[in-house]
Each structure stands twice: as structure tokens, then as C-alpha cells.
């Protein structure tokens, strides 16, 4: 496991010696073992906790088109991450950590952002319709927004879903991923919000476009004996496609989607314990251009996924609504 992790961290270092603006292609010479029914075997635990080392979804403009940090910049980030980890260690050793381990700090990464296209590493601009849809979104993360009913909360607030592609990016906690396979089917279990993606690979036709779902409707196929390609459409409008829990995401959970949204993913196994995850999101109604990101997954079959006990109907939603009603009542009384 340590060797696999070292390979993931070392790869950007090698690229850094060449051109910091170039992302090397995923190595696809590795041929994984096959399942009992002859498909590439991706089964196992693939948590993405190790990606939670302060690399943002979107690149800080100071880095321009650079995909990787310089040695000096990486050392600065590593020091910052080490300081965060030290605070945890101090609390842990003194017995005052409490529930602190619900969030973990990973080792620093040399990447300037998870987004690799556009070249500036940032989400493309909204179209006029995209801006209108974003302005209409509701969430507990939106500033100065009242909460009058459940429609004023997003699907993550209500413990329903983080949606896609947000669910595929690291956050501060619950980063477990596990892949299961059966003949003609791949399932990806996600720890956050206890969801599972079901991806047919048997060539069955997709569902009609009028049937939409929170995680969309996926169809997959195998390429080169080591790559799972997944295309997902039929997304149910509602969730923000980015999530504030991912460092560097828009801060108000207000990145919308339209019925034309499409997600294309490539899971390439580059070694027995490594997968390169590439994704491209296209939604011409919302964005002025497609955007793409890359993450490196590392196998950890010992990672345990426990119950995610957040559920719709818990006290938080009621408390938000009651607080808004209380504030409105106070405002009426003071105006009389």
C-alpha cells in the first residue's frame, strides 16, 4: 500500500521536471486480472481520503495554467498540511479530541487543482440560462436566504444525495468508495450519504430520457482490458453538481444542471493498487464549455464503510424552518 501511495505522489514530481502545465496521460499498459466471467476485475476498496490534502477543485488564479506546484510551493503546502495534522495530534494525545476524527487530513499533493480543463483549472462561465438557474437554487449554504419550507434546502441538506459529479470528489470526511461487480454490472458504493451507483455493462439500452434520477442513468463498457468507460445522462435537477465540502468549490452549493447534462468517466487501472479517474462534464445549457478533472485512486481493501446515519426528516431541517418563522414573527412585532 505504501508503495502504491508513493507512486501516486511521485508521478507529479516527475512531470514537474518537464512542464508544469502538462498532465501526463494515464498509463494504460497494465492488464488487471479478470473476474470469473471474464471482465477486468476492479473489485475492492478505493477510498479517496488520501486526496484530501488541500488540493482544491478549482485552481487559484496565481498558478495560471500550471497543473503542478513547484518544489517551493509544494513545500509550503506540505508545511500547512503538517501543521493541521499536528493540531489533531495535540488534541488526540491530550484526550480532548472529542469527535475530531470524523475529519482527517491527508498528505499534501502537488496538483494545483483537480480540474484540468479548461487550462486555467477553473469551472467555465455560466450561460445566461445557467446564471438564472443558479440564482434560483436554494441551500443552507446560500447567504441571506430564509428557510420557509423543505424546498429551500438542497438534496445534501436533506441527506438525500450529493449528486454527480460532486459525489466523486473528496471532502473532509466519509470518502469511502468500494467497487462491486457482477456479470454485466458494476456497482460503486459511496460512503457519503450511503449511495450506490449501478452501472450496467451488458450493452442493454438506456432508459427513456424522460426518466430522471438523482445520480442519473449510467451505461458502461470496457476498453483496452483495463478501462471502464461510463456515460451518464438523465439527471434529476436539484443537487448542485459541485459541493462546498470539496475544497475550492463554489461556496454556496449553487452550480445547477439541465436536462442536457452528460457525464463521461474513465476508470483506468494503471497497476494492481491504482486507478486513474478522469471525468468530463458537458452541459451547454448551463456552461459555456465542458470541463474535465482527474483524480488518482489508491486501493485500500481494509477501509471500512460504516453507517451514514444522516437521514431526511431529522431535527436540522425543522430547526432551520422554525428559526426563520421566529425571526419573521419578531420582525412583525418590532414593526408594529
What are these regions (language model features)?
Residues 14-336:
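PEST-like low-complexity, intrinsically disordered acidic/proline/serine-rich tracts
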Residues 1-10:
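Bacterial N-terminal signal peptides
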Amino acid at each position: 500500500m505504501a508503495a502504491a501511495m508513493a507512486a501516486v505522489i511521485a508521478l507529479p514530481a516527475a512531470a514537474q521536471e518537464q512542464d508544469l502545465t502538462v498532465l501526463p496521460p494515464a498509463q494504460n499498459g497494465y492488464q488487471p486480472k479478470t473476474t470469473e466471467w471474464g471482465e477486468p476485475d476492479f473489485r475492492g476498496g478505493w477510498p479517496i481520503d488520501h486526496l484530501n490534502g488541500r488540493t482544491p477543485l478549482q485552481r487559484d488564479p496565481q498558478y495560471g495554467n500550471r497543473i503542478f506546484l513547484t518544489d517551493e510551493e509544494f513545500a509550503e503546502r506540505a508545511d500547512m498540511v503538517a501543521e493541521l495534522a499536528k493540531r489533531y495530534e495535540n488534541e488526540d494525545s491530550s484526550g480532548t479530541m472529542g469527535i475530531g476524527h470524523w475529519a482527517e487530513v491527508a498528505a499534501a499533493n502537488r496538483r494545483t487543482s483537480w480540474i484540468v480543463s479548461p487550462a486555467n483549472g477553473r469551472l467555465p462561465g455560466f450561460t445566461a440560462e445557467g446564471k438564472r438557474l443558479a440564482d434560483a437554487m436554494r441551500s443552507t449554504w446560500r447567504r441571506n436566504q430564509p428557510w420557509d419550507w423543505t424546498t429551500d434546502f438542497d438534496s445534501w441538506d436533506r441527506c438525500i444525495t450529493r449528486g454527480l459529479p460532486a459525489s466523486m470528489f473528496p471532502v473532509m470526511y466519509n470518502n469511502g468508495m468500494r467497487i462491486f461487480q457482477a456479470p454485466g454490472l458494476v456497482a460503486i458504493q459511496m460512503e457519503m450519504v450511503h449511495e450506490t451507483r449501478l452501472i450496467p455493462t451488458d450493452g442493454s439500452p438506456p432508459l427513456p430520457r424522460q426518466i430522471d434520477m438523482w445520480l442519473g442513468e449510467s451505461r458502461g463498457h470496457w476498453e483496452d482490458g483495463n478501462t471502464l468507460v461510463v456515460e451518464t445522462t438523465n439527471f434529476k435537477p436539484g443537487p448542485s453538481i459541485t459541493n462546498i465540502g470539496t475544497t475550492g468549490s463554489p461556496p454556496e452549493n449553487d452550480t445547477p444542471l439541465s436536462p442536457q447534462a452528460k457525464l463521461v468517466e474513465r476508470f483506468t487501472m494503471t497497476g494492481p493498487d491504482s486507478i486513474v479517474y478522469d471525468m468530463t462534464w458537458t452541459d451547454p445549457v448551463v456552461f459555456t464549455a465542458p470541463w474535465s478533472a482527474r483524480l488518482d485512486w489508491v486501493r485500500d481493501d481494509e477501509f471500512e464503510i460504516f453507517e451514514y446515519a444522516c437521514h431526511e426528516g431529522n431535527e436540522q431541517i425543522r430547526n432551520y424552518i422554525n428559526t426563520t418563522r421566529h425571526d419573521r414573527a419578531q420582525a412583525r412585532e418590532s414593526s408594529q
